[in-house]
Amino acid sequence: MASLKDLEGKWRLVESHGFEDYMKELGVGLALRKMGAMAKPDCIITLDGNNLTVKTESTVKTTVFSCTLGEKFDETTADGRKTETVCTFTDGALVQHQKWEGKESTITRKLKDGKMVVECVMNNAICTRVYEKVQ
């Protein structure tokens, strides 16, 4: 089973399925969904003890959040939502659970065959994005 340390590094998106449907379920407008679907972001994960930083960079937008594992924090997402978020490391996966306005979404990052597989879920919308390590 992977450790959190195994997820640390710079990852580049190489495959994406269902992202536009997931964004639509989140309530993202059409124009931003189209731009988001075209973006090929890098995800940079850094650790300092129990402190986690996740930076997502693309030509469209760069977002960063930092948190302490297991503690709630206020996150502003790439699409502008203000969420109450908690990140945990459970069963070899980094789980990011967001809550806002009575809604919930979960983003799970885990290693599979040397790649980082990210699953984004809200209601029945499920998105899978695959990243390869570049650093």
UniProtKB/Swiss-Prot annotation:
Disulfide bonds: 120-127
Keyword Ribonucleoprotein tagged: no
Modified-residue entries (Phosphoserine), positions: 3
Keyword Isomerase: no
Gene Ontology terms: cellular component: cytoplasm; cytosol; extracellular space; glutamatergic synapse; nucleus; postsynaptic cytosol; postsynaptic density; postsynaptic density, intracellular component
Single GO molecular function: retinoic acid binding
Binding site residues for hexadecanoate: 131
Record PTM N-acetylalanine, positions in chain: 2
One GO-annotated biological process of the protein: phosphatidylcholine biosynthetic process
Phosphotyrosine PTM positions: 131
Pfam families referenced in this protein's UniProt entry, alphabetically: Lipocalin
Record family assignment: Belongs to the calycin superfamily. Fatty-acid binding protein (FABP) family.
Functional summary from the UniProt entry: Intracellular carrier for long-chain fatty acids and related active lipids, such as endocannabinoids, that regulate the metabolism and actions of the ligands they bind. In addition to the cytosolic transport, selectively delivers specific fatty acids from the cytosol to the nucleus, wherein they activate nuclear receptors. Delivers retinoic acid to the nuclear receptor peroxisome proliferator-activated receptor delta; which promotes proliferation and survival. May also serve as a synaptic carrier of endocannabinoid at central synapses and thus controls retrograde endocannabinoid signaling.
Protein name: Fatty acid-binding protein 5
Gene name linked to the record: Fabp5
